[in-house]
Amino acid sequence: MIPSKEEALEELRIAEEMNPGPWAKHSLNVGIAARNIAEKIEGMDADKAFIFGVLHDIGRRVGIVDIPTHVYAGYEYCMQKGWDEVARICMTHSYLLMKDEFTYDPETEHEKRIKEYVSSIEADDYDKLIQLCDALAVDYGFVILEKRLLM
């Protein structure tokens, strides 16, 4: 289950009030990029892609935290809301190589749970789309991948 576009935008607004920062505009731009790309791909739902993009970083609502903490906080929040598909995106968006990201033994409980989760699934088209759009989008718009990945 996923929220409506309106619910997703309201969740982002609330989260930005809780933890102001450029991440919220970045998230909106991820949603816009995901929607625009999904519109051109047969079988993809552009509205779903937009919602996934808008909410991929919703775990940042808890404050300025490291990647595993915001990933897991987003997953937990979305699961509590009953948004299992969005929760999946929260877990997968920061791990482009999925299980191969973990060339080390995770130390924190968050990292252990993330590793277990991403190791148990294969990235689908929405996971890959949000990973791509996460790299393209910044708070002020979009950049070429080379610039974003080298920043």
Mark where each language-model region is:
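Non-catalytic interface/linker regions that flank or bridge core catalytic/transmembrane domains
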Residues: 1-3
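Generic N-terminal amphipathic, Lys/Arg-enriched alpha-helix
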Residues: 5-20
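Active-site hotspot residues in diverse enzymes, especially metal/ion-binding acidic/histidine motifs
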Residues: 6, 33, 37
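Divalent metal-dependent catalytic cores for phosphoryl transfer on phosphate-bearing substrates
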Residues: 13-16, 41-150
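Short, contiguous strand/loop micro-motifs
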Residues: 21, 36, 60-62
